[in-house]
């Protein structure tokens, strides 16, 4: 059920307090116990593959935690999740998206009959999205006979003028649709093997699917068959594989 406007703002204020407290405590703990805090963050990063990512050392990203940029990004993500309109078994939001040629369309346009449609939300500056991109491509190779796939390029997770990581791709926050389309074109160098579209500048699909910084879904016949947990800590293409294998068996 859609939150009434006063209720939404009350929830936003509560989230603001939670995030501010989290960042303040994180700063204090990082100052007093830097080694322990880094160990805890590295332990969490095992879920994302960041600890195994050859393009990043922990010094490229752990020092950015609890910064002002970290605060604003986490707050944006947490606020966005208040607008989550999805649940397994529920109707999938038919949000507008834009093809790389600039044509406006909708998510449901990519559904074909009763075939499952796998949605992969992410951006080039999201290390876990890129690190696991080959896993996603293998899903396409293995299940293209029974399912369709769609990549939805959303706002940058770690824009160079936002919560930036060292040694990451240099893409600034998108100021207009052309910026977003240019960023999405970089994915073509990775041969995605499925259509790539971008979210509108209102970020409607990202908000209604609570997709920032990255997330996986499986739709079927207009409904949500699988709702992956939000990334980066819980972005798992292997869970989509299990869903598709069950459908194929």
Swiss-Prot record:
Q: Which SUPFAM superfamilies match?
A: Thioredoxin-like
Please give the InterPro entries that the UniProt record associates with this protein. Answer: Iodothyronine_deiodinase, Iodothyronine_deiodinase_AS, Iodothyronine_deiodinase_I/III, Thioredoxin-like_sf
Catalysed transformations (reactions) = 3,3',5-triiodo-L-thyronine + iodide + A + H(+) = L-thyroxine + AH2; 3,3',5'-triiodo-L-thyronine + iodide + A + H(+) = L-thyroxine + AH2; 3,3'-diiodo-L-thyronine + iodide + A + H(+) = 3,3',5'-triiodo-L-thyronine + AH2; 3,3'-diiodo-L-thyronine + iodide + A + H(+) = 3,3',5-triiodo-L-thyronine + AH2
Q: Which regions of this chain are Extracellular-facing, per the record's topological domains?
A: 1-12
Q: Which PROSITE patterns match?
A: T4_DEIODINASE
GO MF annotations for this entry? thyroxine 5'-deiodinase activity; thyroxine 5-deiodinase activity
Please give, as recorded in its UniProt entry, the membrane topology of this protein: Single-pass type III membrane protein
Question: What is the active site of this protein?
Answer: 126
Indicate where this protein is primarily found: membrane
Q: Name one GO biological process term.
A: thyroid hormone metabolic process
Broad EC category: oxidoreductase
Q: Which UniProt keywords apply?
A: Cell membrane, Endoplasmic reticulum, Membrane, Oxidoreductase, Selenocysteine, Thyroid hormones biosynthesis, Transmembrane, Transmembrane helix
Cytoplasmic topological domain: 34-249
| Disulfide bonds, paired cysteine numbers | none
What EC identifiers does the entry list? 1.21.99.3, 1.21.99.4
Q: What does this protein do?
A: Plays a crucial role in the metabolism of thyroid hormones (TH) and has specific roles in TH activation and inactivation by deiodination. Catalyzes the deiodination of L-thyroxine (T4) to 3,5,3'-triiodothyronine (T3) and 3,3',5'-triiodothyronine (rT3) to 3,3'-diiodothyronine (3,3'-T2) via outer-ring deiodination (ORD). Catalyzes the deiodination of T4 to rT3, T3 to 3,3'-T2, 3,5-diiodothyronine (3,5-T2) to 3-monoiodothyronine (3-T1) and 3,3'-T2 to 3-T1 via inner-ring deiodination (IRD). Catalyzes the deiodination of 3',5'-diiodothyronine (3',5'-T2) to 3'-monoiodothyronine (3'-T1) via ORD.
What PANTHER family does the record point to?
Answer: IODOTHYRONINE DEIODINASE (PTHR11781), TYPE I IODOTHYRONINE DEIODINASE (PTHR11781:SF22)
The similarity comment for this entry is:
Belongs to the iodothyronine deiodinase family.
Assembly and partners are described as: Predominantly monomer. Can form homodimers but homodimerization is not essential for enzyme activity.
The protein depicted here goes by the name Type I iodothyronine deiodinase
The species is Sus scrofa
